[in-house]
Amino acid sequence: MSLFVASRSAFRAAAPLKRQFQIRRYATEPPSADAKKGNNTLLYGAAAAAVAGAGYYFLGGTPAAKKAEEKVKDASSAAAGKLSTSEVKQALTGGEQGWVSLKLEEVEIVNHNSKRLRFRLPEDDMVSGVHVASAILTKFKPVDAEKPVIRPYTPTNDEDARGYLDLLVKKYPNGPMSTHLHDMVPGQRLDVKGPLPKYPWTANKHGHIALVAGGTGITPMFQLCRAIFNNPDDQTKVTLVFGNVREDDILLKKELAALENNNPRRFRAFYVLDDPPKHWTGGKGFITKDLLKTVLPEPKDENIKVFVCGPPGMMDAISGNKKSPKDQGELKGILKELGYSPEQVYKF
């Protein structure tokens, strides 16, 4: 039985890493059920909208009702054929637009040091305008400071979501922006600008991609994964290696587990912890050369891409850091030692 079929746990770490590493290649996958749906997408999307709408009517006015309402909007967008963002109004258009003020609507505590912040877009029928593998800039000016603090963040909401933009923010001890965002309460506003294009993704651009992430570096990876698996025409295979300090530091773990369970033959995830609990059966310590050599697609496979995103120390060890947002810098570290070329690696 396939490893992917046999394991349906929330964490890939439920199976010992030694067992996981026995399988490097994916089995040939037949056309997915989604690819066979064809015109049923409209029917199912409309049905989803109707169900979500019924839930909203029943819940009327409660916090859960707001989430149901968002599902109605998103399902309706899908039922309408998922219009491209060029065909709907975009909140962030880049260029000469300048900064846009967004109101914080909702705050969700994710774990001991991370929050999900939902900001309302200027109009309810707008999409953010942030495409796959893109980011935004955030800005605020501390009291008595001469200059504002500006930091990039990758939104985690679907690019087709209407009326809102979500940021997943980890608070760092000496991080002025992350501290400011964690201190915000609903009703306050944040200046944002974008989108900032990173990697120009298109369906089936690569046959297999590998994602090496650390901490909040998972956000652009998740954005990319969701776009791939939400598109029935995109048959890209994905391998994720995700490093964190402790188990409760693993961000988006439920969402990643759902993607893995729904796409067991095209998506596998490996988790590594610096400070694992006693019951942990996944990787321990740092992301190592042996681990990457075992689970990543081989560099001799031409139609692959390895994406890397994480704290500076991890980036330095895995691929070398970027010189600037527009300069990828020299390829160094483990990936170079394993034989990957600069053209096969992208640093977020």
Swiss-Prot record:
Record-annotated FAD-binding FR-type domain positions? 97-202
Name of protein: NADH-cytochrome b5 reductase 2
Query: Where does the chain bind FAD?
Result: 205-240
Molecular-function annotations in GO: cytochrome-b5 reductase activity, acting on NAD(P)H
Alphabetical UniProt keywords: FAD, Flavoprotein, Membrane, Mitochondrion, Mitochondrion outer membrane, NAD, Oxidoreductase, Transmembrane, Transmembrane helix
Record's Gene Ontology CC terms?
A: mitochondrial outer membrane
Q: Which reaction does it catalyse?
A: 2 Fe(III)-[cytochrome b5] + NADH = 2 Fe(II)-[cytochrome b5] + NAD(+) + H(+)
Q: Which family does it belong to?
A: Belongs to the flavoprotein pyridine nucleotide cytochrome reductase family.
Please give the function described in this protein's UniProt entry. May mediate the reduction of outer membrane cytochrome b5.
Which cell locations does it reside in? Mitochondrion outer membrane
Co-factor(s)? FAD
Listed PROSITE patterns: FAD_FR
Main localization category: mitochondrion
Annotated GO biological process: ergosterol biosynthetic process
Q: Which residues cross the membrane?
A: 41-61
E.C. number = 1.6.2.2
The family database entries (InterPro entries) matched by this protein are listed as: CBR-like (IPR001834), Cbr1-like_FAD-bd_dom (IPR008333), FAD-bd_FR_type (IPR017927), Flavoprot_Pyr_Nucl_cyt_Rdtase (IPR001709), FNR_nucleotide-bd (IPR039261), OxRdtase_FAD/NAD-bd (IPR001433), Riboflavin_synthase-like_b-brl (IPR017938)
Q: How is the protein disposed in the membrane?
A: Single-pass membrane protein
